[in-house]
């Protein structure tokens, strides 16, 4: 198993997903032994789904087992709701969401070789695409900075059982594992044994296919990453660059862009609709499970809905007082700028508010409408009415946040208020 270790576990926050079943019990035991030699100590994480009448007993078993091994255990209770999914898929979704919230650097899962074969066959039966058919990678990114690690993939269910017997390891059996109403169990107990009996080395053939598909997928991902890097090379998603690709590559680039921004990738039809609008229309807007996607001025913008709501902190109100105090109090950073406001202005009373239709700023000898300045900077129409503006006590505009100061008041190496949740326009 040493050959399966990811680089540099020392100092990493490592946890084993412990169900109490044979596989995870063996994995935790192995990692505790390896950790004593390698200088790292794994923790354990148990997800209490509440689906079995024995769920509390399983949690108690996991606690006792971890006490025996001398490792820490955290038990997390989740409420599983189907929401249009099967019970297995819904439980898996909740489980992985709980894993992600904990922010481990390395999360070790106990999937083994037989699980890999079952996963491939399930993807075949359900019509999965390349990513589904490639089954489970040994290591993959997870959460913001972590990885999921499956060190038991080279080993069979029998290998794991033999190890448990050799070391006298206890475990619990989930009664649902024998219920052939679940498709995975039908494959495990009926279909795969029959295929293995009829086709010599059937499991080996499946695993060879999985390895080949994983290599193809890795190559495809490399190409997509390079494509997306070029499309976003100017610091934003450039629709004109995206349009130079073939339809297939455009779809993959779009999917990768959404995934990289933390957006749940929609189904194929929804993805095709986004691609169609980007190709045919000048503007577009989509709500995607807690996110807003905006197409405007040849660019694609992503906003988290909760963040968009926060941007409305000045809507229908204005804040008066010492400018430095009210700006820092509202989360602004006072950054140095070649043509910013003088320090003494920030010590005076003023007003923080959103832009108004009549607002103008002196720019290079002429006065420009603030809203036209924002339009020229390709600011989304939805953001323009809530964009912050700094005015003096007489309500005359001094500076447009994140953008520029009025030339009549600006000095070299002055100060420009910048709010981190709004785009930077300079």
Curated annotation (Swiss-Prot):
One of its GO terms (molecular function) is ATP binding. Keywords: ATP-binding, Cytoplasm, Ligase, Nucleotide-binding, tRNA processing. GO terms for biological process: tRNA modification. InterPro entries: Lysidine-tRNA-synth_C (IPR012796), Rossmann-like_a/b/a_fold (IPR014729), TilS/TtcA_N (IPR011063), tRNA_Ile_lys_synt (IPR012094), tRNA_Ile_lys_synt_N (IPR012795), tRNA_Ile_lys_synt_subst-bd (IPR015262). The keyword Cell inner membrane does not apply. ATP binds at residues 19-24. It is found in: Cytoplasm. GO terms for cellular component: cytoplasm. It comes from the Bacteria. Its main location: cytoplasm. Its EC number is 6.3.4.19. Pfam families: ATP_bind_3, TilS. Gene3D superfamilies: 1.20.59.20, HUPs. Ligates lysine onto the cytidine present at position 34 of the AUA codon-specific tRNA(Ile) that contains the anticodon CAU, in an ATP-dependent manner. Cytidine is converted to lysidine, thus changing the amino acid specificity of the tRNA from methionine to isoleucine. This is tRNA(Ile)-lysidine synthase. It comes from Neisseria meningitidis serogroup B (strain ATCC BAA-335 / MC58). The gene is tilS1.
């Amino acid at each position: 198993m040493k050959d399966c270790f990811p680089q540099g576990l020392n100092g990493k926050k490592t946890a084993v997903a412990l169900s109490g079943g044979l596989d995870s019990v063996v994995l935790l035991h192995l990692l505790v032994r390896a950790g004593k030699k390698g200088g790292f100590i794994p923790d354990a994480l148990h997800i209490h789904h509440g689906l079995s009448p024995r769920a509390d007993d399983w949690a108690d078993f996991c606690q006792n087992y971890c006490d025996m091994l001398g490792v820490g255990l955290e038990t997390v209770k989740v409420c599983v709701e189907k929401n249009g999914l099967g019970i297995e898929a819904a439980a898996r979704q909740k489980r992985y969401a709980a894993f992600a919230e904990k922010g481990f650097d390395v999360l070790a899962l106990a999937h083994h070789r037989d699980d890999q074969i079952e996963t491939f066959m399930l993807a075949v039966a359900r019509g999965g695409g390349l990513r589904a058919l490639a089954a489970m990678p040994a290591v993959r990114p997870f959460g913001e900075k972590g990885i999921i690690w499956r060190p038991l993939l080279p080993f069979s269910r029998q290998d794991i059982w033999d190890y448990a017997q050799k070391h006298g390891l206890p475990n619990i059996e989930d009664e649902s594992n024998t219920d052939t109403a679940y498709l995975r169990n039908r494959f495990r107990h009926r279909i795969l044994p029959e295929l293995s009996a009829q086709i010599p080395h059937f499991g080996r053939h499946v695993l060879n296919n999985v390895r080949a598909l994983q290599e193809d997928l890795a190559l495809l991902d490399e190409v997509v990453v390079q494509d997306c890097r070029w499309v976003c090379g100017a610091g934003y998603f450039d629709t004109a660059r995206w349009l130079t690709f073939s339809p297939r590559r455009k779809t993959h680039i779009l999917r990768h862009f959404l995934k990289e921004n933390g957006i749940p990738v929609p189904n194929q039809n929804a993805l095709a609709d986004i691609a169609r609008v980007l190709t045919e229309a000048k503007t577009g807007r989509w709500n995607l499970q807690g996110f807003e996607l905006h197409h405007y001025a040849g660019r694609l913008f992503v906003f988290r809905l909760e963040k968009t709501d926060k941007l409305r902190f000045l809507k229908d109100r204005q804040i008066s007082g010492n400018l430095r105090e009210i700006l820092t109090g509202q989360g602004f950073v006072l950054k140095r700028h070649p043509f910013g406001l003088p320090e003494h202005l920030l010590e005076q009373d003023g007003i923080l508010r959103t832009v108004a239709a009549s607002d103008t700023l002196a720019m290079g000898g002429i006065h420009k409408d603030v809203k036209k300045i924002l339009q020229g900077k390709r600011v989304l129409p939805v953001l323009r009415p809530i964009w912050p503006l700094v005015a003096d006590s007489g309500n005359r505009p001094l500076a447009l946040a994140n953008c520029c100061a009025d030339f009549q008041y600006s000095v070299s190496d002055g100060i420009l208020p910048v709010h981190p949740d709004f785009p930077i326009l300079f």
